[in-house]
Amino acid sequence: FQNFNLLPRASALENVELPLLYGRVKNSQILALKALERVGLAKRSKHRPNELSGGERQRVAIARAIVNKPAIVLADEPTGNLDTSTGNEIMSIFSSLNSEGTTIILVTHERAIASFARRTIEMKDGYIYKDKINSEIAV
């Protein structure tokens, strides 16, 4: 999610719909709109990436990632380019997805973001040096 990787000439809806089109999924536009609703962007569905803020682009990328209802979402620095408030909104979306059964594997260098996780694994020089279950989760 670091760079969003959205198609610049496609609307938010079209960007989210793309994986469904590759899979030839029926009702792809409806499913894509539901994913945008999930991340709070249904009203911005016709906007292109250059018309969206960084946080909105990030949410479009998340909607695209979850539109196929994956069991696991891999997120590399999903809040790295965002202000604290928007980063917390993104983490709230991930927390909600996780509470519904989606496994979220998230890479971050920010302890505040890591505090949202039930479990954190810290690495140094390619090795795990800390693996802990968090008793208090930020939400």
Go through the PLM ranges and name each one.
Residues 1-123:
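ABC family nucleotide-binding domain
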Residues 120-133:
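H-loop (His-switch) and adjacent beta-strand-loop-beta switch element
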Residues 134-139:
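ABC ATPase nucleotide-binding domains
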